[in-house]
């Protein structure tokens, strides 16, 4: 039903019309009212009991209804608007902000509707918007997945930054690099747990040709942040080696996690710890860098094949 409404709206006016349907309708709560004439009479009577200031053009202007009207407007708070639920907010939000709010609200419906336009429509309805707001997203499912990955990366960066501040303040000890990398990757992958049953579908979308550039950008940015907060200051070829290796470790651990039925994914974290320990003993030769890069590409291709086999499974084995 939501998709049909969205198509009709698109035909009628396109993206802007969808925005008008989804966006909260502003209702001016405090309309300007001209002050009654008796106000001026009362003010004049009161002013007679006070010392009159010297006459000037400014004071003459101040006594006019036009000036009082201007002062009244300046003293009023900014117009406030209400949505369908009667909640107030000031001003408008941009199209991007509106989309981000809808996508964030849609995440709670992923377990029931998957990474789909239906989940987005439910998210819009939870914000008291029209389900037709799902039509704002040309590739709903993929945009929802990319939004989630971006959100998770931001949360990880905040965690790592907070940990760094505690170390700088002396309230926490700096972790060995091996432990730091393991904890960072584990923290990031744990963010998938609420959607673990739907994650094969998400990975399949991330590996679609049209989404690979965005997926790789998010992945490499996340890995770079982890190494940055780990204290990596290398400027030689090892800079590339370390990031390529950690990228491969993250991808393979993510696939292991999808098939892990152990309590709290214990087998996954053990696998991760072993791979991190092995990686820290690697050399930094150019030959190893090249082979590592090839391994990452092969890993992505292998992931696509694995996901093809995993797609459709509703439960982990």
From Swiss-Prot:
It holds the Pfam family COQ9. The keyword Glycoprotein does not apply. One of its GO terms (biological process) is ubiquinone biosynthetic process. The keyword Transit peptide applies. Pathway: Cofactor biosynthesis; ubiquinone biosynthesis. InterPro entries: COQ9_C (IPR013718), COQ9_HTH (IPR048674), Ubiq_biosynth_COQ9 (IPR012762). GO terms for molecular function: isoprenoid binding; lipid binding; protein homodimerization activity. Residues 85-96 have a biased composition (Acidic residues). GO terms for cellular component: mitochondrion. Keywords: Lipid-binding, Mitochondrion, Transit peptide, Ubiquinone biosynthesis. A 1,2-diacylglycero-3-phosphoethanolamine binds at residue 243. Residues 45-97 are annotated as: Disordered. Residues 1-46 form a transit peptide. Gene3D superfamilies: Tetracycline Repressor, domain 2. It is found in: Mitochondrion. Belongs to the COQ9 family. PANTHER family: UBIQUINONE BIOSYNTHESIS PROTEIN COQ9, MITOCHONDRIAL. Homodimer. Heterodimer; two heterodimers of COQ7:COQ9 come together on the same side of the lipid pseudo-bilayer and form a curved tetramer with a hydrophobic surface suitable for membrane interaction. These two tetramers assemble into a soluble octamer with a pseudo-bilayer of lipids captured within. Interacts with COQ7; this interaction allows ubiquinone (CoQ) isoprene intermediates presentation to COQ7 and facilitates the COQ7-mediated hydroxylase step. Membrane-associated protein that warps the membrane surface to access and bind aromatic isoprenes with high specificity, including ubiquinone (CoQ) isoprene intermediates and presents them directly to COQ7, therefore facilitating the COQ7-mediated hydroxylase step. Participates in the biosynthesis of coenzyme Q, also named ubiquinone, an essential lipid-soluble electron transporter for aerobic cellular respiration. Structurally similar to the bacterial FadR protein (fatty acid metabolism regulator protein). This is Ubiquinone biosynthesis protein COQ9, mitochondrial. It comes from Xenopus tropicalis.
């Amino acid at each position: 039903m939501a998709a049909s409404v969205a198509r009709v709206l698109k035909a009628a006016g396109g993206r802007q019309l969808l925005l008008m349907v989804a966006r909260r309708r502003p209702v001016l709560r405090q309309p300007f009212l001209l002050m009654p004439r008796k106000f001026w009479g009362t003010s004049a009577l009161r002013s007679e009991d006070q010392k009159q200031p010297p006459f000037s053009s400014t004071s003459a202007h101040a006594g006019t209804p036009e000036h009082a009207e201007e002062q009244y407007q300046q003293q009023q708070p900014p117009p406030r608007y209400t949505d369908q639920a009667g909640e107030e907010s000031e001003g408008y939000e941009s199209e991007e902000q509106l989309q981000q709010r809808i996508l964030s609200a849609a995440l709670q419906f992923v377990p029931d509707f998957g990474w789909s336009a239906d989940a987005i429509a439910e998210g819009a309805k939870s914000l008291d918007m029209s389900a037709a707001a799902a039509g704002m997203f040309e590739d709903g499912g993929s945009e929802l997945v990319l939004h989630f990955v971006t959100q998770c990366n931001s949360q990880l960066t905040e965690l790592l930054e907070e940990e760094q501040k505690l170390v700088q303040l002396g309230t926490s000890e700096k972790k060995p690099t091996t432990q730091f990398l393991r904890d960072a990757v584990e923290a990031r992958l744990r963010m998938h747990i609420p959607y673990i049953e739907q994650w094969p579908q998400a990975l399949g979308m991330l590996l679609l040709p049209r989404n690979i550039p965005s997926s790789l950008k998010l992945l490499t940015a996340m890995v770079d942040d982890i190494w940055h907060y780990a204290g990596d200051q290398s400027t030689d070829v090892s800079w590339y080696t370390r990031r390529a290796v950690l990228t491969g470790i993250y991808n393979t651990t993510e696939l292991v996690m999808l098939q892990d039925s152990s309590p709290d994914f214990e087998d996954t974290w053990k696998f991760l710890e072993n791979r991190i320990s092995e990686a820290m003993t690697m050399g930094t030769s150019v030959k190893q860098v090249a082979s590592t890069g090839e391994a990452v590409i092969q890993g992505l291709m292998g992931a696509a094949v694995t996901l093809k086999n995993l797609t459709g499974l509703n439960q982990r084995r």
